[in-house]
Amino acid sequence: MKKFRWAILLAVLVACLLLWMQTLNVMCDQDVQFFSGICTINKFIPW
């Protein structure tokens, strides 16, 4: 039962990470000044 709980936790974390990446991509496309530094780093990480 404990393994099942860990699997759910991991799935939620992965989903949140994917959502965050989508949000970053949208912000980068709109060229928001605050996100420009993050976008530069984001380009070097192969998502």
Swiss-Prot record:
The chain crosses the membrane at residues 6-26. It comes from the Bacteria. It is found in: Cell inner membrane. It is a single-pass membrane protein. GO terms for cellular component: plasma membrane. Keywords: Cell inner membrane, Cell membrane, Membrane, Transmembrane, Transmembrane helix. Belongs to the MgrB family. HAMAP family: MgrB. May form homooligomers. Probably interacts with the periplasmic domain of PhoQ. This is PhoP/PhoQ regulator MgrB. It comes from Cronobacter sakazakii (strain ATCC BAA-894). The gene is mgrB.
